[in-house]
Amino acid sequence: MPELGIVIVSHSADIAKGLVSLIREVAPDIPLTATGGLEDGGLGSSFDHVQVAVDSQPANRLLAFYDLGSARMNLEMVEEFSDKKILIQQVPLIEGAYAASALLQAGASEVEILSQIN
């Protein structure tokens, strides 16, 4: 089981999907899950979708990246119910998730990744 994974939470399914595509170009092998939008396909953040993204992660420690405040709130609520350690990052979504993913793919440690993106 991998030690560290990446979770992306966006208000837009298109942003989440596009960011995963971008990341997979530089980090094809890392544990990566993403969610965006609401059940009806609209914009927003869903507790249930975030919970699925976290629960489907094979890693037990997760670097979580989000776009707007309610996405962070949903990450915080999911963290309360999860056995996984979720490290919510307050960095720009695309740049932060991309850099962290590339570093993780290259074998950087959690400490090294956090020092580079913060």
Task: List each language-model region with its residue ranges.
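N-terminal loops that bind phosphate or other acidic moieties
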Residues: 1-118
